């Protein structure tokens, strides 16, 4: 499963919107300056996710980064 597919699955399972996640990621790690357009690119697979962005996503969703290692 790709990073984008994993993110889509997590968002669906948890009932969270991209807007909610972007806002939460910026609260947790303001230095990443995530915006909706960039996150949408990640979710659709058109853009790669940096390590910091991945960590912020995991913290926002309260999950372990290990879910992306499968």
Protein language model features and the residues they cover:
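A short, Lys/Arg-rich alpha-helix, primarily the initiator
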Residues: 1-24
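Flexible coil/turn residues that form the inter-helical turn or adjacent wing/linker of helix-turn-helix
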Residues: 3, 14, 32, 47-50
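Conserved hydrophobic/aromatic packing and binding residues within compact polymer-binding modules
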Residues: 7, 21, 39-42, 68
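Helix-turn-helix DNA-binding elements, focusing on the entry/boundary residues of the two helices
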Residues: 18, 36, 51-54
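Short alpha-helical "recognition helix" segments of helix-turn-helix
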Residues: 21-28, 57
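DNA major-groove recognition helix of helix-turn-helix
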Residues: 25, 43, 53, 69
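Recognition helix of helix-turn-helix/homeodomain-like DNA-binding domains
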Residues: 29-48
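DNA major-groove recognition helix of helix-turn-helix/homeodomain DNA-binding modules
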Residues: 50-67
